[in-house]
């Protein structure tokens, strides 16, 4: 009988929140790391939310997942991240009414400085980190800069939700099935400045460029619908995307660990290598493939003037966020 692999330690911050709740049961069921990998869950919360996280842990116990070896609940990052193989950093300070952008960056800069340092001290050698909490790109930048012993490319931010949204919108417009759409790309920030790119996509046996040629639809419908989808969901349901964000986080880690299909790629925000003119070190979204457990930016894509302008605008926003947190001493 084949021996099962050693258990993977998975830490989820903001575990009592709605995205955490929507993620944890699917992780415990094996949807993120595959059907053969046992899971040890670490739920990390702020002290005031520990009781709620303990309630979630009780529900996880009651689900009797065969892969779930144990669950711990912590409010101390050093204990919550001890030996972690995969860290989903979902918890962050949300923007409250009247809050200035600088205040938001400062509040989250403190959170992700602490978490980056704790990961640096106690996480497993091969730790993979996914930042979901917004502003995700810059929070990932702060965490990575405070974890100098962990390779920077192990810190990523979630743009798979935007990627999935783009696939869904292109499927709706083209009449194709979601499964037949490949090679969509998200560039830049996980914000309304992001650029969902279909010029290199495949829609069944058709080129995404065919659909991009309809500039009225592209600029008046597709791009703004994808870029502003989060706001539209808040407006409609009175709460932010939770299940779809959890789904995207699971997709992201699944593909990171288990690989992307040979004929497709996905979108991930990760520290730039200088590719496509994005300043080195800036955490920006790119089209990527997962090869042997590591992300590789897809190279050689032709970027026309239309795309270049949109990529540069989003990168400019990321540079201003980076400069702000640098000025605050977080990086």
Curated annotation (Swiss-Prot):
Catalyzed reactions: (S)-malate + NAD(+) = oxaloacetate + NADH + H(+)
Name the HAMAP family for this protein: Malate_dehydrog_2
Q: Which InterPro entries match?
A: L-lactate/malate_DH (IPR001557), Lactate/malate_DH_C (IPR022383), Lactate/malate_DH_N (IPR001236), Lactate_DH/Glyco_Ohase_4_C (IPR015955), Malate_DH_AS (IPR001252), Malate_DH_type2 (IPR010945), NAD(P)-bd_dom_sf (IPR036291)
State its role.
Answer: Catalyzes the reversible oxidation of malate to oxaloacetate.
Keywords, sorted A to Z: NAD, Oxidoreductase, Tricarboxylic acid cycle
Give the organism, scientific name: Rhodococcus jostii (strain RHA1)
Q: Belongs to which family?
A: Belongs to the LDH/MDH superfamily. MDH type 2 family.
Binding sites annotated in the UniProt record for substrate: 95, 101, 134, 165
This one is known as: Malate dehydrogenase
**An annotated GO BP:** malate metabolic process
The root-end lineage is:
Bacteria, Bacillati, Actinomycetota, Actinomycetes, Mycobacteriales
Which Gene3D superfamilies does the entry mention?
A: Lactate dehydrogenase/glycoside hydrolase, family 4, C-terminal, NAD(P)-binding Rossmann-like Domain
| Enzyme class label | oxidoreductase
Pfam families, per database record: Ldh_1_C, Ldh_1_N
């Amino acid at each position: 009988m084949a021996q099962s692999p050693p258990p993977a330690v998975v830490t989820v911050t903001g575990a009592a929140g709605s995205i955490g709740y929507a993620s944890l049961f699917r992780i415990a069921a094996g949807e993120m790391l595959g059907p053969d990998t046992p899971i040890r869950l670490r739920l990390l919360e702020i002290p005031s939310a520990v009781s709620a996280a303990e309630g979630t842990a009780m529900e996880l116990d009651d689900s009797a997942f065969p892969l779930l070896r144990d669950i711990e609940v912590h409010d101390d990052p050093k204990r919550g991240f001890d030996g972690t193989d995969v860290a989903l950093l979902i918890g962050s300070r949300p923007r409250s009414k009247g809050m200035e952008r600088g205040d938001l960056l400062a509040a989250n800069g403190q959170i992700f400085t602490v978490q980056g340092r704790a990961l640096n001290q106690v996480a497993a050698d091969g730790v993979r980190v996914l930042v979901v909490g917004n502003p995700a790109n810059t929070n990932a930048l702060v965490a990575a800069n405070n974890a100098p012993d962990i390779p920077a490319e192990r810190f990523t931010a979630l743009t798979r939700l935007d990627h999935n949204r783009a696939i869904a919108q292109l499927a709706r417009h083209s009449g194709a099935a979601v499964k037949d759409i490949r090679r969509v790309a998200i560039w830049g920030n996980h914000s309304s400045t992001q650029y969902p790119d279909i010029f290199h996509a495949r829609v069944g046996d058709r080129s995404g460029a065919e659909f991009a040629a309809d500039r009225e639809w592209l600029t008046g419908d597709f791009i703004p619908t994808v870029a502003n989808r989060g706001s539209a969901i808040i407006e409609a349901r009175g709460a932010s995307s939770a299940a779809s964000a959890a789904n995207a986080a699971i997709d992201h880690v699944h593909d990171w660990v288990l690989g992307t299909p040979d004929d497709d790629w996905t979108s991930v925000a990760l520290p730039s290598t200088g590719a496509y003119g994005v300043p080195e070190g800036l955490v920006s979204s790119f089209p990527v493939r997962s090869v042997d457990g590591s992300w590789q930016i897809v190279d050689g894509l032709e970027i026309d003037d239309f795309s270049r302008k949109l990529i540069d605008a989003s990168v400019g926003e990321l540079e201003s966020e980076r400069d702000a947190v640098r000025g605050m001493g977080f990086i």
